């Protein structure tokens, strides 16, 4: 008599019903594997796993340590930056903090610059001291102060600065800084978010590492959170090891959206460079504008540095209105095309008053201590027609007159 298979929970049948091996595909876009972990072959699993652990077999193990989509994004950014390796993480802030934790030892010392993203400053000034790490803060152009810091603290392991900086778009002399830091074996890390790899090749200029909030220009559509750190293989490996401990993993879909954004990076940045420069020039001539901060203008304190090491000056223009807090707010409220939002680098133009959107909780004294003026406006130029953007900004300046 033929035996009838015993009906159970179907676990064995479920295992046997695994999907077939992937077909060779000629798809134009990357296929995203949504996995938290990766299984190995059903034959010689342990031997293959040992080979993977010893670096003799290329594969993926666990989602926090990497996945094919993220690795593809890392490779593209690596090539764009002319770097040896690249790590993509969950945000630009995650990339910065993971780097600092990985490369600055307990009791160590770091040098940074005055004008920078608020949360980076907060991490350096309030979190690192808990591990005995001290910091010297210098003006972006003050090479003498950097040299003095390196002499007084030869244990300085890292110089870290944005270039251009946020929000005043100061530029540091990367080759000169790299030469000074080489004397003491100090690593140089440059946050090149405002520049992009198209406008500035920080690694070629002497930086050991270059960081990006990939949320901004690299992804470019105001719909992704991601960070990237590229550079020499050794420091990137150290950051990757720390990243694997801390987490901060970007998910495969976000990595895919980042890859999508990279496809149009050249088109977007070329337009934004030209439009921002034109808007900066017109703002400088406008009677209601007291000062314009844009490295493409000869009036900018670091224009000579920017002209030497950048091929374009980026899509962000900061400017000061001849008005008080509420008069400046009236300009921001009167624009029609940009969104009022705290980001930059996307296809849509964005505008903000840093006093209100980023530093309101600091109070007047706190804002003054870090150089944030009530009259300051930061404008991130998108891909809209420059004449439309200017007409809108001009009418906002006129309408808001007291």
Can you describe what each PLM-predicted range is?
Residues 42-94, 119-127:
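Conserved N-terminal alpha-helix of the aminotransferase class I/II PLP-enzyme fold
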Residues 247, 335-345, 396-402:
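A common structural junction motif
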Residues 289-377, 381:
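Conserved C-terminal alpha-helix-loop-beta "cap" of PLP-dependent enzymes
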Residues 86-288, 293:
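Conserved PLP-enzyme active-site core in the AAT-like
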Residues 84, 125-126, 134, 148-152, ...:
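PLP-dependent enzyme catalytic core of the Aspartate aminotransferase-like
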Residues 22-28, 39-40, 68, 230, ...:
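Positively charged, small/polar-rich N-terminal and surface patches that mediate targeting and assembly
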Residues 1-60, 402:
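N-terminal glycine-rich, Lys/His-bearing helix-loop that initiates the first secondary-structure elements
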